[in-house]
Amino acid sequence: MADLKPSLTGLTEEEAKEFHGIFVTSTVLYLATAVIVHYLVWTARPWIAPIPKGWVNLEGVQSALSYLV
């Protein structure tokens, strides 16, 4: 006998659980990758100055911008 209450997505219960597992795993991997990459970029060039002269690496950018303005 057919299901009396068909799914809105057309997936069976087993297929929905499999899809959910893959979705959760890929989301966790994406977030972990983003955290690692943000940490690596932060160590290379912090975007918030931790000390008063924390923006010394941007002196070249300031001189380049002076030519544009």
From Swiss-Prot:
It comes from the Bacteria. Its main location: membrane. A bacteriochlorophyll binds at H20, H38. Coiled coil: none annotated. SUPFAM superfamilies: Light-harvesting complex subunits. The chain crosses the membrane at residues 22-44. Residues 45-56 are periplasmic. The core complex is formed by different alpha and beta chains, binding bacteriochlorophyll molecules, and arranged most probably in tetrameric structures disposed around the reaction center. The non-pigmented gamma chains may constitute additional components. Belongs to the antenna complex beta subunit family. Antenna complexes are light-harvesting systems, which transfer the excitation energy to the reaction centers. This is Light-harvesting protein B-1015 beta chain. The gene is pufB.
